[in-house]
Amino acid sequence: MGHNGNSYYIGIDLNDSYAMVSFFQQNMKEPETVSTVAGSEEFQIPLVLARRKSIGKWYYGDEARRLSKSGEMVCIDQLLKRALNSEKIVIDDDSFMAEELLALFLKKVMELPSKLGNPSSFDRLVICVDRLTKENVSMFYGMAVRLGINSRQLTVIDRKESFYYFALNQDKSLWLHDVVMFMQEKESIFFYSLKRDLRTTPQVVSIDCLLYTSDAADEP
């Protein structure tokens, strides 16, 4: 499904609070992250859906959060957790599986790059989550059809693998030595450290992760 030989990729960084969407084509130097507001550098999209009562129209992200303050809207958050728990959500006389609503949210954010003039179809969708489990990998591949793609177009990775790809696609001088990355989520800071073992052939790359909270530092 290449576009004149220029492969087109969409990436979604996902946790239970927000999503971030980026796109990349081979004529670009690096991926570009998109916002729901043109010209804004606020890239975190709240993982929230809202539905107007009796009409059935869905809103997502910041707009859903804002409109949910009205008594006319029903708001659903924690979609990732609810989907993994196979929750059923009842709104008025309608019932939805949380996995179905998570897929609806993902479809909406997947459309953001096309609003910037990019193709509406893409070659690969990469979803990045905190950790890979049998349950979340199975769920995402199971919802591929709902997302309008086939399973061969989908890749699910965790943050360690994402960090690995990011680091080794930088200038070589940046990863000749150890590479570290800090990531903040609410009151916690994640510390990732990438190391290369130069004594082995081929070289072995290892990534360690520490979680720093207000109380202690532990491995997540």
Could you tell me what each predicted segment is?
Residues S120-D130:
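Short glycine-rich phosphate-binding loop at a beta-alpha junction
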Residues N4-G5, I12-Y18, L174-F190, L194-D197:
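A short acidic Gly-Thr/Ser loop motif
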Residues M1-K88, V145, Q153-Y165, L198-I207:
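Early-domain small/polar-rich strand-loop-helix modules and first-structured segments
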Residues L104-L116, F163-Q170:
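Phosphate/ATP-binding catalytic cores across multiple sugar-kinase/actin-like superfamilies
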Residues N4, G117-F122, N150-S151, S173-W175:
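Short helix-terminating capping/connector loops at secondary-structure junctions
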Residues C75, F96-L106, N136, S214:
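Phosphate/oxyanion-binding active-site loops and adjacent basic polyanion-contact surfaces
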Residues Y212-P220:
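Single conserved hydrophobic/aromatic residue that forms the stacking wall/gate
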Residues K134-G148:
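Short, low-complexity, polybasic intrinsically disordered segments
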